[in-house]
Amino acid sequence: EIEKITRRFAQELIKRDLISPSMNVPAPDIGTSSTEMAWIADEYRKINPVDINGAACVTGKPANKNGLVGREEATGRGVQFIVREFFRNPELLKLVKLDDDLSSKSFILQGFGNVGYHLSKFLTEDDKVKLIGLAEYNGGIYNEDGINVEHAKKYFIKNKSFENYPKASFVKDSSLLLKRQCDILIPAARENVITEKNAADISAKLIVEAANGPISYKGNQILNKNRIFVIPDILANSGGVAVSYFEWVKNIRH
């Protein structure tokens, strides 16, 4: 059903010239993956068989279907790079009253999809940052001693929930995890999760917007007043868009 809906939607977009290699090039987001992107590209080729740049009508395709190796994890990798650069900047660290030892820091993550999974994997394995809280739509887990990303991922895929997870405390209302004490809070799910209703309760010193628009305007005003530093989404999660551009260039240059 998903394939039928995706292909039909793509057909209607293409027939109306709403997507093409030179205009409105889609990429994966919540609920989609490289599979859906491949279906869209396939429909474009069927409707425009003589367009030699047809593969560039969409990015985030599988590597074996004119995609780019590394695109899947690019957004999470980009957030990791931004966090690293922040901790290399003495002036910014002074503002949030943190030292430059990233490996001694803790973080809480909201969202365990493509971006959240890869980001938490990179931060914990490469930079030794401790993941102490993990929030999903149907509950979260907390362990101040750290959470193993791969173990948590396997459990969530199998059970579709963190309930009864053996190596951390289950938190039914995962939004409460946003208020827990940590050095870095990373919302990587949906928009408007930090608003005027809960911004005053945020205790993290640094917030990194891995999701698009996770902080509302009024919520941001409260965070500014409380001197909580926010790395905005337009910078923090730009890794995916950057690598999508590389894929697009690869396609139009053949």
Positions of the model-derived regions?
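Glycine-rich phosphate/diphosphate-binding loop of Rossmann-like nucleotide-binding domains
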Residues: P62, N66-K179
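Conserved active-site and cofactor/substrate-binding residues in soluble primary-metabolism enzymes
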Residues: K4, R8, G31-T35, W39, ...
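Structural signal for hydrophobic packing residues in well-ordered secondary-structure cores
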Residues: E3-P21, A41-I52, V83-E91, N114, ...
